[in-house]
Amino acid sequence: MGEKPDKYEILQDLMRRRGFAWGSFEIYGGSRGFYDYGPLGATIKRKIERKIREAFQREGFFELETPDITPEKVFIASGHVEKFVDPLVECKKCGARFRADHLVEEALGIDTEGMSAEHLTQLIREHDIRCPECGGELSDVWYFNLMFETRIGPYGDQKGYLRPETAQGIFVNFRRLNAFARNKLPFGVFQIGKAYRNEISPRQGMLRLREFTQAEAEIFFNPNETEHPHFDEVKDEKLRLYPIEHQLKNLSMIELTAEEAVKKGYIMNTFFAYYMVMVKRVLLDIGIPEDKIRFRQQLPEERAHYSRDTWDAEIHSERFGWVECVGIANRGDYDLSRHMRESGADLTVLIHYDEPKIVKKLEVSLNMKRVGPKLKKDAKRINELIKGWGEEKKRELVELLEKEGKVTIEGYELEKDDFIIREVEEKITGEKIVPHVLEPSFGIDRPFYLLLENSLVIEEDRTYLRIKKDMAPIEVAVLPLVAKEPLKSIAYDIFRTLQKEGFIAVYDEKDTVGRRYMRYDEIGTPYCVTVDNQTPEDGTVTIRDRDTREQIRVKIEELPKKLRELIFES
């Protein structure tokens, strides 16, 4: 027996040769982390985006489109300027730069997730880890911000960044989106577009890009209402889970229904579980095999700075193992609270009660007769400031006065008797809350590559893509048996009819029909329609199945209906 063929290399060759995808800027030597989609690849990519868009729209989500370039202050508020970093190290001899955590992982075979720059530097020194390019000594580790920086306008005085995620464009529009949703939670907003990350050393082909496409939904909900109203529709769906405790104990993944996973405490609530099922169903609809999908819960040190809990939908790759393709994160109120604080905008939602409630509230104000001589012209301003404080801050003030007997406000030391404090009852009909956010975030490029990898079939006499039929970049090829009349004219008329019926179709008369079958099998075309010598006699053609190679005969007038059944309804 010969060596097992290298599936990765075969797929890379097929992708380049047949027009799916290849590295960008080839004629100038290329640039790592950038890929171009060819005619066939771009079609599949659009189909993936369409499947995700349709899934979001079925949930009643609204679509938004916002700029790729974003002013710096947005990312200061979101935490990306401070937190969106990777550890970097430089060779003192040749100047090459590398991800420090990757170098340490490869050299020592350990997990470096969550390690500080100081800890990584210590390991590099202790184990004498050298530059993989020239063997030179490495510098201390420092943090490198992954956002692409730019300048907005001709004067260069406004710094901006290419967005590292599409989400912030949604958060900064929350006031308008909430008004559009009529102030009613929950509601979802999604965006499909480009994101950019200046990866230090992008590797693994299409799996780590500097420019990539995301489809992110931000689902705004009341944190006091975490039961999804339609959970019963998905509660029996099975999910393959790899929770934190199983990772820490080196246990295998488990398979539970969505309902069991919530009851056992693996998934925090039915709201979260519902959207995990939605993500799984989208991946299945794209054509990822069910046994290649799992959900892995991120360890606390892995989570993004905004995340309270994250589960990654991972797809298995023969070459790369389990690959993160979708993140489902509970972002809490992190983003809206940060943008409220930095912008001063009110990003709350008024929640109306079913019935009015009587609540006890603190009223705190200054005793103006006592403090007037002390505060003089500042007395009125400070009094209004205190009266405008929230309930929590007022209670903190009272506790401090009880404990210390005095406080300092705006540089003035004030005693307990300087305040008028009383508890009152108030009837309220609702309350303002900062909504929490659940975010299903799809990458598009990784599922694209893994769909092709998991569709590639290598047989003795052919290599072909057994891609899900409605995901094929060319849905039907129309072939005259030989390039002679009247077969050519009949075949071309059928081709034009199928185009008008909405099929992605091609007409091909070059080479033997056997070679043409192989050509279209290779790129995943599910059906070839052949016009043969019987066609002029009885008005029938053959439909050849890519996977089985079997053929059936149908009448030309029935062809669009039959193909629609085979491709989109089977």
UniProtKB/Swiss-Prot annotation:
GO terms for cellular component: cytoplasm. Substrate binds at R99, E165, F212, T213, Q214, A215, E216, E439, P440, S441, F442, G443. It is an enzyme of class 6 (ligase). InterPro entries: aa-tRNA-synt_IIb (IPR002314), aa-tRNA-synth_II (IPR006195), aa-tRNA-synth_II/BPL/LPL (IPR045864), Anticodon-bd (IPR004154), Anticodon-bd_dom_sf (IPR036621), Gly-tRNA_synthase/POLG2 (IPR027031), Gly_tRNA_ligase_arc (IPR022960), GlyRS-like_core (IPR033731). This is Glycine--tRNA ligase. Its EC number is 6.1.1.14. Its main location: cytoplasm. It catalyses: tRNA(Gly) + glycine + ATP = glycyl-tRNA(Gly) + AMP + diphosphate. Belongs to the class-II aminoacyl-tRNA synthetase family. The gene is glyS. It comes from Thermococcus kodakarensis (strain ATCC BAA-918 / JCM 12380 / KOD1). Keywords: Aminoacyl-tRNA synthetase, ATP-binding, Cytoplasm, Ligase, Nucleotide-binding, Protein biosynthesis. GO terms for biological process: glycyl-tRNA aminoacylation. PANTHER family: GLYCINE--TRNA LIGASE, GLYCYL-TRNA SYNTHETASE/DNA POLYMERASE SUBUNIT GAMMA-2. It comes from the Archaea. ATP binds at residues 197-199, 207-212, 324-325, 443-446. PROSITE patterns: AA_TRNA_LIGASE_II. Disulfide bonds: none annotated. GO terms for molecular function: ATP binding; glycine-tRNA ligase activity; protein dimerization activity. The lineage of its organism: Archaea, Methanobacteriati, Methanobacteriota, Thermococci, Thermococcales. It holds the Pfam family HGTP_anticodon.
